[in-house]
């Protein structure tokens, strides 16, 4: 399979180690983080906040794609309506986390792979539509590698 995935590299600049080997830190603009075990949501959120802090302090540090599984929990985005939980938050059957992302309620559970992009978007176009289309193209390319046809629908992302 010689297909090349769609990619957009950030501008070049010095890299910092970020607990990577020096060779990887100097040769990578991004890396994949994929733990072997289930990661509690609150642990992953703490890791992401620390990684983001470092990315802000060292803007040309390697960026990351994290692929994780979480124990069962619910997350609620900034714009979410809590009535979409379908139960009282203080009487939840599972932990509930209000987090700094868009979107509605998400139920996470073992077996579900969650992808987090930890990127310095200031190194790319400051255009949400462009970013979403680039992300969409990466997913279309991955589907193609798996032998599944993916396509865009005009007006939707």
Regions found by a protein language model. Name each.
Residues 1-157:
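N-terminal lobe of the biotin/lipoate ligase/transferase fold
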